């Protein structure tokens, strides 16, 4: 065991030869390196697999011994300054190492085929491997300086991958947005690190926790400064894990390739913020104000991410807001003191979300044959629908990820999310209500994605399609035309994707009303959550999506197995609550909510809470099915729907309310607009003023002196007439004038 720990420092550096050799090869032998580019996937996966087995061995020893191993090298510069570097192996390191390597390996396998036709294939694998190296270095760091170094390296890799297709202006802007937003959090993190060093004189985790604990217990320090610096440390996690209000970069980060979206959202960048809070939790628990702040930020992020996800058209942005909401659950759990619940959900969510992103990549990959390689079309759920018969395997994989994220047993996220919801009831009733509401919204927006993508018909082909029966109507206006508003008097019940005329619009949530003719039962309908417009084309080629190949399906299959069984690590199969694998791995861990509870599981309470959670989940699924499922395919008599709508729905109020929700969600809560008005526009005006002042004033003075000197020289250059005697005479006169001035000055002074 000691031998294994002594060489743990090598974990982050095992995959390092891959990006180094790719870089050298592209620099010295670019043609030959590009010819054998597909070979580089093998060493990337192989070396990361070695790290995975190393991490598994450490985890097994951790479960058996519950030990903490730290090794530090000290470099003394002088008597006052010394730099210490080392590695820390504990339960948190073991969990994160396994998570990073398993997800990283599967994403690399998937990427080998997904990126095979991309010119930046080698660059992509170099960035991805360096990304994994950075995250492994972060989780094995023993002090805050190392944390900050790898923290910035993670950020750099994420910016490179978000802007991977940098020739696209949208991708370049998304990269810039991620960089600027994270700079705010990273600056706060740096100030917090410097402040903690000023207070404690140490940056080693174990030392600074003990020092601060002693200082607080003896009342020998100002709590204001400790709280301030702890809050600054937390700012780094707020930006990196896309917590409110620094979450705005996350949806735009979807401009990168889909495999990197899976890695960022599952095991690397956004997980880094959760890891940092978990690592610093022994410090934060000493400061109740900080714990309450963490819980508050997490709670806002939970509900904000859920509400912003319900009206997005882009499948990846939908999943991005889903990630934001789930990260809010983890942050909320950490703020409540539920260390185990937060890490449990981090594990289960990572595999489920990786599965969903790889599934969405498979869907996008199949849609590109129909709509081209524009992300605005291939990722747009408006063009999808009816993919069940075209990509059935992908549908099954995506459904498993959807069920897991919704919290349906026996899938992984059910166990972890249910634990957080139970802990929220112990923490505060208000927090519990909001957290449970977000759980219902999660089921709604996830099944919204599933139904829009896989149910119904393939929308891209339906410019003017009618079903065989009048009661089965399906026609859609898809792209590029302006909206035409029509005034109507009667308002009837809404069905998804009904027949519309050219240049008219329908969508997936009631917002505006347009006239439609469908039978005599429904004369006009209202608009649902996002608009679908016309291509302006008369004909479409009858192409259909194809299933992904075996390489991509293999990665998704393994993630399905993880999604099915990884939840078992947190299930107690005996009566003791500390006898499950996760609890053994996390010993010792912080639990502020169950200090006085008995060490036995109350199964009645568990089933009661689980039943309540499932009721909320199924309610969200029902609402999603009500709005988005092709109900017209199953109902022969629409009079019943019209009767229900006429008698029970107050249409005016309903339309107004749904319009508010639509605008809020589709416009990202107006937060980007607020930042644009309050910060960005002001900064731009300041920059323009500085540019004007620099060019017209500073440069103007300098250039004016130069131009004046030039013209003065031109004016007097002919005074001497070109004769040496004239130059000598002028020179003598200048000397005499200088002597006279000097003598005058001396006499006046004395």
From Swiss-Prot:
Main location: plastid
Pfam families: Proton_antipo_C, Proton_antipo_M, Proton_antipo_N
GO cellular component: chloroplast thylakoid membrane
Membrane topology reported for the UniProt record: Multi-pass membrane protein
Record flagged with keyword Thylakoid: yes
Record-linked InterPro entries: NADH_UbQ_OxRdtase_chlpt_su5_C, NADHpl_OxRdtase_5_subgr, ND/Mrp_TM, NU5C-like, Proton_antipo_N
Enzymatic reactions: a plastoquinone + NADH + (n+1) H(+)(in) = a plastoquinol + NAD(+) + n H(+)(out); a plastoquinone + NADPH + (n+1) H(+)(in) = a plastoquinol + NADP(+) + n H(+)(out)
Segments crossing the lipid bilayer: 9-29, 39-59, 89-109, 125-145, 147-167, 185-205, 219-239, 267-287, 290-310, 327-347, 354-374, 396-416, 427-447, 554-574, 606-626, 728-748
GO molecular function, one term: quinone binding
Domain of life: Eukaryota
Subcellular location: Plastid, Chloroplast thylakoid membrane
Name of the top EC class for this enzyme: translocase
Annotated GO biological process: ATP synthesis coupled electron transport; electron transport coupled proton transport
EC number of the protein: 7.1.1.-
Keywords: Chloroplast, Membrane, NAD, NADP, Plastid, Plastoquinone, Quinone, Thylakoid, Translocase, Transmembrane, Transmembrane helix, Transport
Stated role: NDH shuttles electrons from NAD(P)H:plastoquinone, via FMN and iron-sulfur (Fe-S) centers, to quinones in the photosynthetic chain and possibly in a chloroplast respiratory chain. The immediate electron acceptor for the enzyme in this species is believed to be plastoquinone. Couples the redox reaction to proton translocation, and thus conserves the redox energy in a proton gradient.
Similarity-based family: Belongs to the complex I subunit 5 family.
Subunit architecture: NDH is composed of at least 16 different subunits, 5 of which are encoded in the nucleus.
Stated name of the protein: NAD(P)H-quinone oxidoreductase subunit 5, chloroplastic
Organism: Phaseolus vulgaris
Organism placement in taxonomy: Eukaryota, Viridiplantae, Streptophyta, Embryophyta, Tracheophyta
């Amino acid at each position: 065991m000691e031998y294994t720990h002594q060489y743990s420092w090598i974990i982050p550096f095992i995959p390092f030869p891959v990006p180094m050799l790719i870089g050298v090869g592209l620099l010295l032998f670019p043609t030959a390196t590009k010819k054998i580019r597909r070979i580089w996937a093998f060493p990337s996966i192989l070396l990361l697999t070695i790290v995975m087995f190393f991490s598994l061995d450490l985890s097994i020893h951790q479960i058996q011994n519950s030990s903490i191993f730290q090794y530090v090298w000290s470099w003394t510069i002088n008597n006052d300054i010394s730099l210490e570097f080392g590695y820390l192996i504990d339960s948190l390191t073991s969990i994160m190492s396994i998570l990073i390597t398993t997800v990283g390996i599967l994403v690399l396998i998937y990427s080998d085929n997904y990126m095979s036709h991309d010119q930046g294939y080698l660059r992509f694998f170099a960035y991805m491997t360096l990304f994994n190296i950075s995250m492994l270095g972060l989780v094995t760091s023993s002090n805050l300086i190392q944390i900050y170094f790898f923290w910035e390296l993670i950020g750099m890799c994420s910016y490179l991958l978000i802007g991977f297709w940098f020739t696209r202006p949208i991708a370049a802007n998304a990269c810039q947005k991620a960089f600027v937003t994270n700079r705010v959090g990273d600056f706060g993190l740096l100030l917090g690190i410097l402040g903690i060093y000023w207070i404690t004189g140490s940056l080693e985790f174990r030392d600074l926790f003990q020092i601060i604990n002693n200082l607080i217990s003896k009342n020998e320090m100002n709590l204001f400064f400790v709280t301030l610096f702890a809050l600054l440390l937390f700012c780094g996690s707020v930006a990196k894990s896309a917590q409110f209000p620094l979450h705005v970069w996350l949806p735009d980060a979807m401009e990168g390739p889909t495999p990197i979206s899976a890695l960022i959202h599952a095991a690397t960048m956004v997980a880094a913020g959760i890891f940092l809070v978990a690592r610093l939790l022994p410090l934060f628990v000493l400061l109740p104000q900080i714990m309450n702040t963490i819980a508050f930020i997490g709670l806002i992020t939970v509900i904000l991410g859920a509400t912003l996800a319900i009206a997005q058209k882009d499948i990846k942005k939908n999943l991005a807001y889903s990630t934001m909401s789930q990260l809010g659950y983890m942050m909320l759990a950490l703020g409540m003191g539920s260390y185990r619940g937060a890490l449990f959900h981090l594990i289960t969510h990572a595999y489920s979300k990786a599965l969903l992103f790889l599934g969405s990549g498979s869907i996008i990959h199949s849609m590109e044959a129909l709509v081209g390689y524009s992300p605005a079309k291939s990722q747009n759920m408006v063009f999808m629908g009816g993919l069940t018969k075209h990509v059935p395997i992908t549908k099954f994989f995506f459904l498993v990820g959807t069920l897991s994220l919704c919290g349906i047993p026996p899938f992984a996220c059910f166990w972890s999310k249910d634990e957080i919801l139970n802990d929220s009831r112990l923490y505060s009733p208000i927090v519990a209500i909001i957290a449970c509401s977000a759980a219902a919204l999660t089921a709604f927006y996830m099944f919204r994605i599933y139904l829009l993508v896989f149910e119904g018909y393939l929308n891209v082909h339906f410019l003017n399609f009618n079903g065989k029966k009048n009661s089965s109507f399906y026609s859609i206006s898809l792209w590029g035309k302006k909206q035409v508003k029509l005034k109507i008097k009667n308002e009837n019940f809404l069905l998804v994707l009904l027949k519309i005329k050219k240049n008219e619009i329908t969508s997936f949530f009631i917002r505006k009303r347009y006239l439609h003719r469908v039978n005599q039962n429904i004369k006009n309908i209202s608009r649902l959550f996002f608009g679908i417009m016309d291509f302006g084309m008369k004909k479409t080629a009858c192409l259909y999506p194809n299933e992904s190949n075996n390489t991509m399906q293999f990665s998704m299959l393994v993630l399905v197995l993880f999604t099915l069984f990884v939840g078992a690590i947190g299930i107690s199969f005996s009566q003791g609550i500390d006898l499950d694998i996760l609890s053994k791995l996390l010993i010792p861990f912080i639990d502020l909510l169950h200090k006085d509870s008995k060490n036995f599981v109350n199964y009645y309470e568990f089933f009661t809470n689980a039943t309540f959670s499932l009721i909320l989940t199924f309610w969200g699924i029902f609402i999603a099915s009500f709005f988005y499922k092709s109900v017209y395919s199953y109902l022969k008599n629409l009079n019943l729907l019209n009767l229900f709508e006429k008698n029970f729905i107050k249409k005016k109020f309903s339309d107004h309310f749904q319009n508010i929700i639509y605008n809020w969600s589709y416009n990202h809560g107006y937060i980007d607009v607020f930042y644009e008005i309050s910060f960005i526009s002001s900064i731009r005006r300041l920059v323009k003023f500085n540019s004007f002042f620099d060019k017209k004033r500073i440069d103007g003075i300098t250039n004016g002196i130069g131009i004046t000197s030039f013209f003065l020289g031109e004016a007097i250059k002919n005074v001497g007439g070109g004769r040496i005697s004239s130059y000598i005479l002028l020179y003598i006169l200048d000397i005499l004038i200088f002597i006279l001035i000097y003598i005058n000055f001396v006499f006046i002074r004395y």
